[in-house]
């Protein structure tokens, strides 16, 4: 019996435990699902996360910086973000899916959005590439959601919000109509809900140089992006 247990541990349990420890306290990879981080990230990209760093931040050691791309779960109070299916397959439970967004505000920052322009502590957010990309296609600068800094529709007229301790204000790079559901809707995200920072895009290896998004605010925009241009090497560091 002991021999069987040792064999089971060596052949099955040990690799599984090692994999769990590696992904929880080492590094793991996640896929980008959707178009909310265009143009920086495209649907189907796979990102590498140093999960050990995420654990350190949750324990109060260091923190995320403005511009970091993070993977997190939306706040528990954001009921509309809870899911009961996975890729169309019904599940007997509800869960909060992981999202990928960019850190815009860190604890203590004051966030204000006017005419689509994000300001942090009174200074315009430096995002020239993002603004240039969406101004070329379909930047949303007028809708209430695009200019909200509140956690509920009834508070959308708040002129600004101060990020609480141990929390972060996150936004998607997609500034088209309905392009990203983020802290403009559900408010700042507690550090305990942030898994880690994405540091590298590792897949696919090759991609088309240009991506043209749909601008109708319709569902599943990631399925309607048009790719063109030459092929280029995709793996790259994700710098703030």
Language-model segments: which ranges?
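Soluble "head" domains of membrane/secretory-pathway proteins
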Residues: 2-10, 25-31, 39-240
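Hydrophobic alpha-helical membrane-embedded or membrane-associated segments
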Residues: 11, 15-19
